[in-house]
Amino acid sequence: MVKETTYYDVLGVKPNATQEELKKAYRKLALKYHPDKNPNEGEKFKQISQAYEVLSDAKKRELYDKGGEQAIKEGGAGGGFGSPMDIFDMFFGGGGRMQRERRGKNVVHQLSVTLEDLYNGATRKLALQKNVICDKCEGRGGKKGAVECCPNCRGTGMQIRIHQIGPGMVQQIQSVCMECQGHGERISPKDRCKSCNGRKIVREKKILEVHIDKGMKDGQKITFHGEGDQEPGLEPGDIIIVLDQKDHAVFTRRGEDLFMCMDIQLVEALCGFQKPISTLDNRTIVITSHPGQIVKHGDIKCVLNEGMPIYRRPYEKGRLIIEFKINFPENGFLSPDKLSLLEKLLPERKEVEETDEMDQVELVDFDPNQERRRHYNGEAYEDDEHHPRGGVQCQTS
């Protein structure tokens, strides 16, 4: 039992979630609420990052489960939180704060794929908009020699204001310079490049050919190094494609195995059957249960080498795992004579010798709402006893 579930609720997972479930939840939420896509959801992005930072660390998670958020804040596991952007970059293959200072931002895109795509391999063309250095001004933003140091921030890109918060007490506030928008330099409007309007970069359409190899997994990243947004003075970042697998109507993937449920009739469970299965590469395989091989409800069997191809070893495959569900016939499907004949064919049932101490009871269909209705009626009855209701009386003349 955990002390509180706030972090689990933020990620939308249960307290017993596995690391894979935590990663999947963080990946989807972080991409959805990233400041680049949702500038107004900064606080939500921060909460998601903090929750994942704690729950993805075994020691911090144990501490949180026992003592809640307060235990984390008190520093029992190296308290305090990292930068949400650092967590995002490390998760998606970028790096920490120091790397972002030397390189442009990584651009992360989610690519929806089917289980068939991951089984057979596929190629997708993805059209993206990215920043590239303006070739008209070669990334200067204007004419040669037109760029000058911003006098307001002295080239730092930051302004420092002193704010008095009490007698003898001042607060130093650092903010982005409004004069140069944090660039540390400015260009006279008449000297600005007409192509980029002094921004040094322009938007350009980029077509990426994404190769999805056989056996790739949900959440796997495909990185295009140096294809991210360009910025003067910085090495271009990467474009990172994150595969997001859609649910399949028949199969569920479990590592290298494929799992499915199969309904069979009672006669098939007792007397054998043949069942066709359409595979993800459009083949049809036939599974056989021979007469005399009894299949019980909930039995799990498998077909070797019919699961998912193994990544980078596509000629090897996992297992196709099948769980069987038995469909029993409806009441009265046999006449009394045929039922008696069937009983003679089946293994003998055990008879119970009744004694005087035994009571005969009747089996009825279970109604899950019966207890709820009885509980509700009981409360209403008690309420009437403690608070008799005065009904509106009819007028008499």
UniProtKB/Swiss-Prot annotation:
Composition skew (Acidic residues), residue ranges: 353-365
Chief localisation class: membrane
GO cellular component: endoplasmic reticulum; membrane; mitochondrion; nucleus; perinuclear region of cytoplasm
J domain segment(s): 6-68
Propeptide: 395-397
Residues annotated for Zn(2+) 1 binding in this entry: 134, 137, 193, 196
Zinc finger (CR-type): 121-205
SMART domains in alphabetical order: DnaJ
Assembly mode: Identified in a complex with HSPA1B and BAX. Interacts with RNF207.
Protein name: DnaJ homolog subfamily A member 1
Organism the protein comes from: Chlorocebus aethiops (Green monkey)
